[in-house]
């Protein structure tokens, strides 16, 4: 009876084409979350409270900041602060170009995500140079 109602048989593709989009969306989401939750606090502490003298200058001395940057938590924090928002921004640029009818195809994808990869790699390299 169901086959009489449904005029076409639905064929399920058992070997679907895999997309790489979940990788980019996860980096986009992580970057957006980091930028929305961590970056404002970082700007508040380092850009407003420290210059106004609310935070003691000794707390941000070269020795303490260098010690923080060379610890695993500090290195991950700095890399996350530089790399994750860049992935978010480049994903927005890539899809924004598509929305504005700049269909760059694979070249645009490689350019955007390649730039984010370069910035991420430079963040890691600069952390190891400290």
Curated annotation (Swiss-Prot):
GO biological process: fumarate metabolic process
Coiled coil: none
Record-linked CDD domains: QFR_TypeD_subunitD (cd00547)
Pfam family, one: Fumarate_red_D
Domain of life: Bacteria
InterPro entries per record: Fumarate_red_D, SQR/QFR_C/D
Transmembrane spans: 35-55, 67-87, 110-130
Record membrane topology: Multi-pass membrane protein
Any GO MF annotation of the entry: succinate dehydrogenase activity
Transcription regulation found in the keyword field: no
Disulfide bonds: none
Cellular compartment(s): Cell inner membrane
Keywords for the protein's UniProt record, in alphabetical order: Cell inner membrane, Cell membrane, Membrane, Transmembrane, Transmembrane helix
GO cellular component, one term: plasma membrane
Oligomeric and partner information: Part of an enzyme complex containing four subunits: a flavoprotein (FrdA), an iron-sulfur protein (FrdB), and two hydrophobic anchor proteins (FrdC and FrdD).
Function: Anchors the catalytic components of the fumarate reductase complex to the cell membrane, binds quinones.
Family, per entry: Belongs to the FrdD family.
Name listed for the protein in its UniProt record: Fumarate reductase subunit D
Organism the protein comes from: Vibrio cholerae serotype O1 (strain ATCC 39315 / El Tor Inaba N16961)
Classification of source organism: Bacteria, Pseudomonadati, Pseudomonadota, Gammaproteobacteria, Vibrionales
Annotated gene: frdD
């Amino acid at each position: 009876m169901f086959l009489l109602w449904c005029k076409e048989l639905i064929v399920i593709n058992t070997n679907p084409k895999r997309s790489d989009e979940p990788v980019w969306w996860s980096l986009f989401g992580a970057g957006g979350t980091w930028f929305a939750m961590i970056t404002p606090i970082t700007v508040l502490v380092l850009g407003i409270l420290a210059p106004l003298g609310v935070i003691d200058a000794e707390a941000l001395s070269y020795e303490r900041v260098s010690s923080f940057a060379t610890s695993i938590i500090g290195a991950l924090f700095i890399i996350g602060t530089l790399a994750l928002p860049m992935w978010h921004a480049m994903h927005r640029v890539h899809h924004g170009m598509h929305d504005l009818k700049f269909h760059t195809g694979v070249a645009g994808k490689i350019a955007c995500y390649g730039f984010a990869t370069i910035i991420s790699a430079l963040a890691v390299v600069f952390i190891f140079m400290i």
